[in-house]
Amino acid sequence: MYSATASNTFFLLSCFLLFCLLSAPSCVSMFSGIETGDLEKRDDLFPQILRDEAVARLYELGKVSDASGYLERTFLSPASMKAIDLIRKWMEDAGLRTWVDQMGNVHGRVDGANENAEALLIGSHMDTVVDAGMFDGSLGIVSAISAVKAMHVNGKLQKLKRPVEVIAFSDEEGVRFQTTFLGSGAIAGILPGTTLEISDKREVMIKDFLKENSMDITEESLLKLKYDPKSVWGYVEVHIEQGPVLEQVGFPLGVVKGIAGQTRLKVTVRGSQGHAGTVPMSMRQDPMAAAAEQIVVLESLCKHPEEYLSYDGHCSDSTVKSLSSSLVCTVGEISTWPSASNVIPGQVTYTVDIRAIDDLGREAVIYDLSKQIYQICDKRSVSCIIEHKHDAGAVICDSDLSSQLKSAAYSALKKMEGDIQDEVPTLMSGAGHDAMAISHLTKVGMLFVRCRGGISHSPQEHVLDNDVWAAGLATLSFLENLS
């Protein structure tokens, strides 16, 4: 029987759908992605290259893994070497001249109409975290190659006003050697010679690992990988947002105005190893208990920095306010020795990841945290060592590049949707990107692409096919209007 309640529900639903269709283009975009209609018939939108082929390549690259059942592709692993060959083949298919440098970065270059002009660098990273999604990093590489291929197909590639170089960076995540930006850092010239001496958990040094992969490198040759700043015009990176903002506002693309600074610490706490059943609680020097207390202090400090730092003398009111909105802290890895259920650990090691837009505020947090870590160790009669594994200052994206990317994104979305009532959003990035390293070499700009649920560093990471298309079309528009 058809009830009055069902009738009312149907009427309300019909009104809502009619409202979406008539007055809110972003509503349609929010729920179902960009409506394509007859767009596939338009040659200037290159759906076969910028969407179909690009998506197929992302899925193909997503299967190149060192693990069975999940995606793991770390710095110059066997899977990474396969990815290098695959990416290089795609670059050559797009009309690019290719090579691989001594840090495992894949380069594809076209000189355009003026080979002596400053070059645009565009790219992202090909390595992944453990149990990764397939869009992080890879989307920026594939969208750049696809845009270049579209220009190659329509005969515009050699007419570029300046050289364009697509780069797939070998290591951004820093999974194996616990130090990020090995690939882009080499290009930017920010890696000290001692970088080659860094060891992984098996005590294999970077220089020996590179040699095993036929990339014999010395401190001198590492320095030679740095690009001459006078030869580079700028750097652009397309990347999934890794957050929920674009999905919430119903926009496929957004322009990044800045990237949070980041510090990685390694904390080692040493105590007295003993039998779990025979050492009285009052006589223990337990590094696990000390580490647990330190981690709780870290959480409190990062949740409420105003309570810890306002009267410290290190922070102004504006810095504390900035920290309250941007500070995030994470303990992502803990290990114990000897790691047995019936043994009081002799040593506990954990990592700390601290990020904030305000560099002075981030440094104040590190200062306060370090002070409290040592106080807890003294109180519990254990020893502590704090190592700084990585430091990267916050980066503000170039205003001119950002403006050009915003225009390119608007142009792409207008071609696909027909009408855009709202402005392309701008947002900050809490995640680190290769653009941070390259900012030491040249001006940088970034374009974010919406991802489902804001999920990243997870197999659940997902980007709509048409959003991949929008990213490629925006990149193409940017290249076509390159000054």
UniProtKB/Swiss-Prot annotation:
Q: How is the cofactor bound?
A: Binds 2 manganese ions per subunit.
Any single biological process term in GO: purine nucleobase metabolic process
Name assigned to this protein = Allantoate deiminase 1
Q: Which family does it belong to?
A: Belongs to the peptidase M20A family.
Q: What induces it?
A: Not regulated during water-deficit stress.
Enzyme type, top EC level: hydrolase
Give the multimer and partner information: Homodimer.
Q: Where are the transmembrane segments?
A: none
> Which species is the source of this protein?
Glycine max (Soybean)
How does its record describe regulation of its activity?
Inhibited by borate, fluoride, L-Asn and L-Asp.
